[in-house]
């Protein structure tokens, strides 16, 4: 009897020591990668162009990844998502000579697109535990906070800008994609990080208002609806409170001019504060360019017009006269620039991300130890739905958020499949496409991919 009473605190102490040891042993590459996520998604280099922060942080992360890893690169390259990402990158390279402006395509691929490929590969290669994924989420939340605070302090005018490369629609897009991850962390996560996530998510809703982005509002409403519908019976009250809080923020801070502009989502017209462009409604403003995009894709179905040159191809399609427009649709953007093969690969990545999240949530029902992976996967899935809705009205085919979400889904699926292969009553078998790539994670456990 005495032995049993003394064994309890010993076991508790052992678990605590293991938990603290896991936190202390977080690989430096994960921290460096979180900083890289912050730099890339937060567009920090725009504020310090002479420092080349993206190159510096990428270099540090790459060196740490190569020095601290014992993984088989060959197996990494056989993952379906990796193959699709590299195939898209390969298409962007081989189509450069056939681009309507080869020099611009070369610049885009070597200066912009390659950073997204690196972001995806290094996340899949280095993130080996649920804790590592959470650390990367800190990088995302920090990027969101930077954009939120910058917009609130320095954003001026009807369509505020706070970076050289993000317009108001882009900022709203980042908020919508990041909001579900922060909300799920607050609802189902533990520790002080959930309160940081809650603050960031609340500010994200306010930021969507400040951007006056119609696509941002529609995407946010869809995400809120999914958040409420997908909540379990235990979480429904808490989720309803979160959704209600978001609605109250929209109602409290949305001005009359804001709602007049939002009314043009469904109908043309609007009040006196609505510009002539907005008064045509979303359909009236977007349909001409969408129709032109479809024709461009049909004219260049195999190799496209070249990566990063949609607006140039669109301008040349009507002789250079008038306005040269962006796609305002990620699916048409990738289809025009990289042809139908690029569009197919793009849709495949979206499909695989949703599938990975479903794998994690299904296995989590069998293994309670996967509770953290489960809410992370749920957040990633909701974020992807926000991306898809926003992608129908924004040119976000080469978004860092997309490659971040796809990579995180791959990491979570490998962690869940590794848990499923452990000996036990329900540990046999694994989801297809995830076996055969193992390494020691940040928590000291083996994680297979």
Summary of predicted features, one role per range:
Residues 153, 206-210, 231-277, 281, ...:
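A membrane-periplasm/extracellular boundary helix in multi-pass inner-membrane enzymes
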Residues 273-291, 295-338, 359-368, 372:
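Long extracytoplasmic/lumenal interhelical loops at the membrane interface
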Residues 47-49, 98-107, 156-164, 209-210, ...:
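Membrane-interface helix caps and helix-loop-helix hairpins in membrane proteins
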Residues 49-57, 108-111, 163-176, 215, ...:
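Membrane-interface micro-motifs in multi-pass membrane enzymes
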Residues 29-40, 144, 356-393:
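Loop-to-helix entry and N-terminal half of a specific, functionally important transmembrane alpha helix
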Residues 1-104, 118, 124, 128-141, ...:
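Transmembrane signal-anchor hairpin modules in multi-pass inner-membrane enzymes, especially those
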């Amino acid at each position: 009897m005495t032995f049993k009473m003394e064994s309890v605190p010993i076991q508790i102490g052992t678990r605590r020591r293991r938990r603290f040891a896991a936190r202390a042993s977080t690989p430096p590459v994960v921290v460096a990668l979180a900083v890289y996520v912050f730099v890339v998604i937060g567009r920090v280099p725009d504020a310090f162009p002479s420092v080349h922060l993206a190159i510096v942080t990428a270099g540090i992360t790459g060196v740490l990844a190569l020095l601290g890893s014992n993984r088989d690169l060959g197996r990494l390259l056989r993952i379906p998502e990796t193959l699709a990402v590299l195939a898209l990158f390969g298409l962007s390279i081989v189509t450069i000579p056939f681009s309507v402006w080869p020099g611009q395509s070369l610049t885009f691929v070597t200066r912009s697109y390659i950073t997204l490929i690196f972001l995806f590969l290094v996340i899949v290669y280095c993130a080996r535990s649920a804790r590592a994924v959470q650390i990367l989420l800190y990088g995302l939340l920090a990027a969101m906070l930077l954009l939120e605070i910058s917009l609130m302090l320095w954003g001026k005018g009807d369509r505020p800008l706070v970076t050289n490369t993000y317009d108001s629609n882009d900022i709203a897009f980042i908020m919508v994609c990041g909001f579900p991850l922060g909300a799920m962390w607050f609802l189902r996560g533990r520790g002080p990080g959930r309160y940081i996530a809650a603050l960031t998510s609340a500010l994200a809703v306010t930021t969507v208002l400040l951007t006056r982005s119609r696509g941002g509002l529609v995407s946010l409403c869809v995400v809120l609806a999914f958040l409420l519908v997908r909540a379990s019976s235990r979480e429904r009250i808490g989720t309803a409170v979160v959704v209600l809080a978001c609605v109250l923020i929209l109602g409290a801070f949305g001005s009359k001019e804001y709602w007049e502009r939002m009314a043009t989502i469904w109908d043309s017209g609007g009040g006196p504060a609505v510009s002539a462009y907005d008064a045509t409604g979303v359909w009236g403003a977007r349909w001409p360019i969408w129709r032109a995009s479809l024709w461009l894709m049909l004219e260049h179905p195999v190799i496209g017009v070249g990566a990063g040159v949609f607006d140039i191809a669109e301008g040349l399609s009507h002789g250079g006269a008038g306005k040269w427009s962006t796609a305002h649709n990620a699916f048409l953007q990738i289809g025009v620039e990289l042809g139908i093969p690029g569009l197919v690969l793009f849709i495949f990545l979206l499909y695989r991300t949703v599938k990975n999240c479903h794998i994690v949530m299904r296995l989590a029902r069998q293994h309670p130890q996967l509770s953290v992976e489960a809410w992370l996967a749920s957040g990633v899935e909701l974020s992807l739905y926000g991306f898809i809705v926003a992608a129908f009205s924004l040119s976000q085919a080469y978004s860092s958020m997309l490659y971040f979400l796809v990579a995180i889904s791959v990491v979570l699926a490998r962690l869940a499949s590794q848990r499923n292969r452990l000996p036990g009553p329900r540990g046999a078998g694994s989801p297809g496409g995830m076996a055969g790539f193992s390494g020691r994670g940040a928590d000291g456990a083996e994680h297979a991919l």
